[in-house]
């Protein structure tokens, strides 16, 4: 995954707030995965148009006290891709 990679939810997967879980979850055909606040903040920005660099920039602006989230965001998005929650493609 590169910072120029564009990430999107896979077909059948979606992020939503689950009141019963009191957290955001990824819903998918086989079940769901409960997310922590950090994971939810990252995935809320995944829209199929933004690249990884744009997501990082938005999070750095939103959470300046974090002191730079670049590596953490890339690592999490790689895990989300390995879990098959999202897809990753290079721009055309």
UniProtKB/Swiss-Prot annotation:
Pathway: Cofactor biosynthesis; pyrroloquinoline quinone biosynthesis. The keyword Zinc does not apply. GO terms for biological process: pyrroloquinoline quinone biosynthetic process. It comes from the Bacteria. One of its GO terms (molecular function) is quinone binding. Keywords: PQQ biosynthesis. InterPro entries: PQQD, PqqD_bac, PqqD_sf. Belongs to the PqqD family. Monomer. Interacts with PqqE. Functions as a PqqA binding protein and presents PqqA to PqqE, in the pyrroloquinoline quinone (PQQ) biosynthetic pathway. This is PqqA binding protein. It comes from Klebsiella pneumoniae (strain 342). The gene is pqqD.
